[in-house]
């Protein structure tokens, strides 16, 4: 049976977004947890709740994303608190979007295994890349220094353990053209008709 709901996951800088961009270019619907999170940040109630949870991360009475980021990536209990608050809200919106689509739909879910959300999907595609390539990618994309990138990576699922999960592992160790070919191969493996 062809899977309908497919998660795309992987650690920071692994190439999830590039892989999902390829799927979009091919014509498939793709939703992103990061985009949904950005939408939630425009919700006044959401931000007020965060302000109450993290009062030390306020600047002029408003939650400061940079302060919050520094706090949660240096304090594992703060990260757990943030994830316990935000992940259910993100996943609720994500599933509502996905359930409205007839046929195959993809979702970029960065912390899929960490949140235990893999059971919500018919199939999982996991991107993997060397740590050095990931560090370089996040430096160019986000301006994170090596220590910040490594700190964030350490809070995520260990890429070496992906074989223990029921997922298709895509090694993102070449250029974008090779990743495109790997995306086509994954679609064939999942028996998804290419658009």
Name every feature range the model reports, one short phrase each.
Residues 8:
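Hydrophobic anchor at the beta1->P-loop junction of P-loop NTPases
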Residues 11:
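P-loop (Walker A) phosphate-binding loop of NTP-binding proteins
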Residues 14:
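ATP-binding Walker
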Residues 17:
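Walker A/P-loop
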Residues 35, 39-102:
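ATP-dependent small-molecule kinase phosphotransfer cores
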Residues 93, 119-120, 140-190, 195:
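Small-molecule kinase domains that catalyze NTP-dependent phosphoryl transfer to phosphate-bearing small molecules
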Residues 93-99, 104-140:
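ATP-dependent NMP and nucleoside kinases share a basic, alpha-helical "lid"
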